[in-house]
């Protein structure tokens, strides 16, 4: 009887603690996708909207992926008549606000891909925040045409 009681207690404890340790609160990802890559190309980009419903300011400091050696936050900016991409070390998302990673603006650059990303696959992204909390999301890989169609639905 004590083994059954201890097992139930452990299960209840895990159910209570698991949500606290695996996500950053009420962060919502929408319109997310990663661009498919042709053979021989070792980088791609991810686009999504990240909504902060936590009631607290969140500062995104890093992103990692199961498919890329490195994920960098970038911002495209016009410098005169040339578009330039610059690295961003952190992004602040106010309570109740959303942040858009989208073509032509901020985006997530996935580099060091060992294999091409094929439409229909999924890519796991793990967001790390300044307070040490994390949030994981699995995004679909879309070909360029499907990704453009999805952007039109935003």
Protein language model annotation of sequence segments:
Residues 9-19:
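Bacterial N-terminal signal peptides
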Residues 25-154:
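Compact, glycine-rich, soluble single-domain proteins
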Residues 20-24:
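Sec/Tat signal peptide C-region and signal peptidase I cleavage site
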């Amino acid at each position: 009887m004590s083994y059954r009681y201890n097992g139930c207690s452990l299960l209840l404890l895990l159910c209570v603690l698991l949500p606290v340790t695996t996500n950053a609160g009420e962060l919502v990802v929408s319109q997310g996708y990663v661009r498919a890559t042709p053979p021989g190309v070792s980088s791609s980009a991810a686009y999504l909207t990240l909504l902060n419903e936590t009631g607290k300011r969140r500062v995104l400091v890093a992103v990692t992926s199961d498919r890329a050696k490195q994920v960098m936050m970038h911002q495209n900016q016009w410098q005169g008549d040339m578009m330039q991409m610059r690295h961003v070390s952190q992004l602040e998302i106010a309570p109740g606000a959303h942040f858009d990673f989208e073509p032509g603006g901020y985006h997530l650059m996935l580099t060091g891909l060992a294999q091409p990303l094929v439409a229909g696959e999924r890519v796991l992204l793990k967001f790390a925040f300044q307070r040490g909390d994390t949030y994981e999301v699995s995004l679909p890989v879309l070909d360029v045409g499907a990704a453009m169609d999805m952007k039109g639905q935003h």
